[in-house]
Amino acid sequence: MRVWTVLLGAVLLLAACQADVQDVETKVKAKWEETVEVFREYVNRLSLATDDITEQITSSQMGKEMDMLIKDXVAELHAYRKDVEERLGPQAVVMRERLHTDVTVLGERLRVDMEEAKTRVQQYLGEARQVAGQNLEDVRSRVGTYLRKLRKRLAKDTEELRRKLEAYSKEATQHLETVREDLEPLREKGQQRLETLQQALRDQGQRLREQLEVRAQEMRGSLDRAATQLQEWLEPFLEDIRTQMQGLLDKLQXKEQQ
């Protein structure tokens, strides 16, 4: 188990280092591509494993690890496909259907080739334990030749899938750009309408304030005029009352002096 863990760890580390170098030189690989690359390197390392290592690796251990890599690659491939489908949008029905069909067919081909590689490696490990010396070299040479062909098929499957997905991803990006370009005039028009409405509301508010100010001034003028008219109307009565009161005061003062 320990040898198996070390071997798998070495494969993953090597694949990660290769991915880092390639990412600097080219572009970042999708996760499903990285998983297939790990699987291919895994197959290669197992086919080149020394006698003492092959004796310690059980088919069940190897099968579980390779099954996990196959499962991860298929799941990551479908996740990548869904991401591209979402970017294509619901309007691109035909393109989405083509993408789904292409990835399903090519993905199944990749899965079958990975399953076959796993079977061949298990077969190699089983035969390697039963022979020794020159016979082991013959088995290794025969199986190694077939595994090299399988690795080439895996590389071809991966490249074909990558090209397809890259083309669809490019179309999805162009589709999004087209949608943005189509929506931009609407956005600008909506912005202009909003600004026009805001300005109209500001103008209407200003006119309303001016109208209210004029009305207030008119009301103040009306009240002032009404007060003046009331004062003018009451003034004779007040003057008459003042005269009468003064007369009464004069009479009272005269009586007091007598």
UniProtKB/Swiss-Prot annotation:
It holds the Pfam family Apolipoprotein. One of its GO terms (biological process) is positive regulation of amyloid-beta clearance. One of its GO terms (molecular function) is heparan sulfate proteoglycan binding. One of its GO terms (cellular component) is low-density lipoprotein particle. Transmembrane segments: none annotated. It is found in: Secreted; Secreted, Extracellular space; Secreted, Extracellular space, Extracellular matrix. Residues 1-19 form the signal peptide. Sequence repeats lie at residues 112-133, 134-155, 156-173. InterPro entries: ApoA_E, Apolipoprotein_A1/A4/E. Its main location: secreted. Keywords: Extracellular matrix, Lipid transport, Lipid-binding, Repeat, Secreted, Signal, Transport. Residues 112-173 are annotated as: 3 X 22 AA approximate tandem repeats. Belongs to the apolipoprotein A1/A4/E family. APOE is an apolipoprotein, a protein associating with lipid particles, that mainly functions in lipoprotein-mediated lipid transport between organs via the plasma and interstitial fluids. APOE is a core component of plasma lipoproteins and is involved in their production, conversion and clearance. Apolipoproteins are amphipathic molecules that interact both with lipids of the lipoprotein particle core and the aqueous environment of the plasma. Homotetramer. This is Apolipoprotein E.
